[in-house]
Amino acid sequence: MTPLLTLFLVVLMGLPLAPVQALDCHVCAYNGDNCFNPMRCPAMVAYCMTTRTYYTPTRMKVSKSCVPSCFETVYDGYSKHASTTSCCQYDLCNSAGLAIPATLALAPVLLATLWGLL
């Protein structure tokens, strides 16, 4: 192999295959109902995350952030407060909150309330 070809291959292997572009997410810490605060996330972040915590059927708080890994969760019915987490991977995808119907989102709260009455 010629020295020029070797140098070309070494330089080519050092180049990234595609430019790395940072993800844009809405970011807020426990806002009242929802928030719209766009922010450029660090390069190693792969997900926008939204967490909603329901204290009562009419009182909830929303938290949105940039996270390197994310696990979607739905309220399990065993803790005092209902909490759900949603993850997505494109710019400003967490603007609308959780992509589940409101009746489904409130179902765990209603079940927890009924469980507490028993």
From Swiss-Prot:
Signal peptide range: 1-22
Keywords: Cell membrane, Cell projection, Disulfide bond, Endoplasmic reticulum, Glycoprotein, GPI-anchor, Lipoprotein, Membrane, Signal
UPAR/Ly6 domain mapped to chain residues: 23-107
Gene Ontology cellular component annotations, sorted alphabetically: dendrite; endoplasmic reticulum; plasma membrane; side of membrane; synapse
Subcellular localization(s) per the UniProt record: Cell membrane; Cell projection, Dendrite; Endoplasmic reticulum
Alphabetized SMART domains for the sequence: LU
Upregulating conditions: Up-regulated by prenatal nicotine exposure.
Membrane topology: Lipid-anchor; GPI-anchor
Gene3D superfamilies, sorted: CD59
Lineage: Eukaryota, Metazoa, Chordata, Craniata, Vertebrata
Functional summary from the UniProt entry: Acts in different tissues through interaction to nicotinic acetylcholine receptors (nAChRs). The proposed role as modulator of nAChR activity seems to be dependent on the nAChR subtype and stoichiometry, and to involve an effect on nAChR trafficking and its cell surface expression, and on single channel properties of the nAChR inserted in the plasma membrane. Modulates functional properties of nicotinic acetylcholine receptors (nAChRs) to prevent excessive excitation, and hence neurodegeneration.
Lipid-attached positions, GPI-anchor amidated serine: S95
Cited PANTHER family: LY-6_NEUROTOXIN-LIKE PROTEIN 1, UPAR/LY6 DOMAIN-CONTAINING PROTEIN
Tissue: Expressed in lung predominantly in airway epithelial cells, submucous glands, and smooth muscle cells, in endothelial and smooth muscle cells in vessel walls and in alveolar type II cells (at protein level). Also expressed in brain.
Location, primary (coarse class): membrane
Proregion residues excised on maturation: 96-118
Protein name: Ly-6/neurotoxin-like protein 1
Subunit structure: Interacts with nAChRs containing alpha-4:beta-2 (CHRNA4:CHRNB2) and alpha-7 (CHRNA7) subunits. Interacts with CHRNA4 probably in the endoplasmic reticulum prior to nAChR pentameric assembly. Interacts with KCNA2/Potassium voltage-gated channel subfamily A member 2.
The keyword Magnesium belongs to this UniProt entry's keyword annotation: no
Single GO term (MF): acetylcholine receptor binding
Cysteines paired by S-S bonds: C25-C48, C28-C35, C41-C66, C70-C87, C88-C93
InterPro entries: Ly-6/neurotoxin-like_GPI-ap, LY6_UPA_recep-like, Snake_toxin-like_sf, Toxin/TOLIP
